[in-house]
Amino acid sequence: MTNSNRIKLTWISFLSYALTGALVIVTGMVMGNIADYFHLPVSNMSNTFTFLNAGILISIFLNAWLMEIVPLKTQLRFGFILMILAVAGLMLSHSLALFSAAMFVLGLVSGITMSIGTFLITQLYEGRQRGSRLLFTDSFFSMAGMVFPMVAAFLLARSIEWYWVYACIGLVYLAIFILTFGCEFPALGKHAQHSQAPAAKEKWGIGVLFLAVAALCYILGQLGFISWVPEYAKGLGMSLNDAGALVSDFWMSYMFGMWAFSFILRFFDLQRILTVLAGMATVLMYLFITGTQAHMPWFILTLGFFSSAIYTSIITLGSQQTKVASPKLVNFILTCGTIGTMLTFVVTGPIVAYSGPQAALLTANGLYAVVFVMCFALGFVSRHRQHSASAAH
């Protein structure tokens, strides 16, 4: 593979995460405007965004098999057509049913693109470099989560209709579409060139189960925590601005942490540093929940920094449980993480209703403790060291 081809594929991976980050995180910015557009209360409107998450979940799950049937380049180009149709549907329709369908299609497109992006990085890079590259790729999710809410605020403040925000997000996919030209993708399944000797199917091992549970608990814990921090802070008497600043501080330090750890991870055994980071994140979250108001900004800043590498390290370790990175295995762990996203309000909503926001934060803290236990247990069964050693020879 030529270096320019590798660079193009890497940029497609970066932009695939930016696309999903933009679609997921911009929701809160435009929800009120969309509710006004359809003359509905915001609480009713939030339910329709479940179609976006459902689309992401279904596409990540199905793409483990689709990748072996439909070439990656074809998927990305067809996704561009679907993106245009979905954005056109948002612009031209006043029907809530068509809005929900367009959101579902956007979810499908971003889920397929993100699973392809993750797979490309696991194919292009080996060992510790794979972990640092995946982490840098994941930082584009956070970066888009910072940039596109600002774009949305800029457009909405000038009374420009909300659907133009989605047209702007579509420009990210336009860049992906352009990059597919003159670019060779790894072939999979029936499209791959098979050697004379059939490849032996590798068993995943129990380590993959530990990582799948860790992925689900981590995402559910993280989103359950950050979703209820503003309500918890307001309950302590903090202003709305100060409560919002806690969330901004978390994501800002999370992004800086990703950049820092994309360099740091190269020098450590991934399972060991993951266990340390999961343990530190669990302690820091507990200190945030039980600490004084004066210390809360410091605890959430350090929590964001030290938890930033956890999810990507889980995916990287998963890809290293087999000698050859398996798209089904990577997509299985991604699917578990996405299930965590889907369950966020299903799990935390009733807890808040019965026991208040602090109980939801303590539940999230318990989920982080489960992540720590899973990562610690993985140390006894992980195959990443033997596969890294054999790749080095």
From Swiss-Prot:
SUPFAM superfamilies: MFS general substrate transporter
Location(s), subcellular: Cell inner membrane
InterPro entries attached to this UniProt entry: MFS (IPR011701), MFS_dom (IPR020846), MFS_trans_sf (IPR036259), MFS_TsgA (IPR023528), MFS_TsgA-like (IPR050375)
Primary site of residence: membrane
Membrane topology value: Multi-pass membrane protein
Keyword Lipid metabolism in record: no
Keyword annotations from UniProtKB, A to Z: Cell inner membrane, Cell membrane, Membrane, Transmembrane, Transmembrane helix
Any Pfam family matching the protein: MFS_1
Highest taxon, organism lineage: Bacteria
MF terms (GO), sorted A to Z: transmembrane transporter activity
Disulfide bonds: none
Gene3D superfamilies documented for this protein: MFS general substrate transporter like domains
One GO cellular component term noted in the UniProt record for this chain: plasma membrane
NCBIfam families in the cross-refs: PRK03699.1
Family of this protein: Belongs to the major facilitator superfamily. TsgA family.
Protein name: Protein TsgA
Organism: Salmonella arizonae (strain ATCC BAA-731 / CDC346-86 / RSK2980)
